[in-house]
């Protein structure tokens, strides 16, 4: 295990992103508004070859849905990186499986 601190990434957001967020907030439809449906439609048509997709409220929810769709559940063990956000292990536990943490390579940030 490394004792060296690995800094997390800083998001890069510009005027376009700020304007889009402002429009959503001003609409009052933050969870299931037209922008969410437009995103789901565009994502499913351009990224996942027309397979239906659903936007969720958090990374934890996204990981949880992915685990359930993959059949991961009680009695399973899932290897997860030790350098990660809490959602990684929490979503595994929420699915009924056991998260098993493994060290990451400090250069590549991949499982070591």
Where are these regions (language model features)?
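ATP-dependent adenylate-forming carboxylate-activation enzymes
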Residues: 103-112
């Amino acid at each position: 295990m490394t004792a060296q601190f690995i800094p997390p990434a800083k998001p890069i957001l510009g005027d376009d992103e700020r304007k889009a967020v402002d429009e959503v907030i001003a609409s009052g439809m933050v969870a299931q508004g037209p922008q969410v449906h437009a995103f789901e439609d565009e994502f499913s048509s351009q990224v996942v070859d027309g397979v239906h997709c659903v936007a969720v409220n958090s990374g934890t929810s996204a990981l949880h849905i992915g685990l359930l769709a993959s059949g991961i559940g009680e009695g399973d063990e899932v290897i997860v990186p030790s350098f990660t956000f809490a959602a990684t292990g929490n979503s595994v536990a929420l699915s009924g499986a056991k998260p098993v943490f493994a060290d990451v390579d400090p250069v590549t940030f991949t499982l070591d």
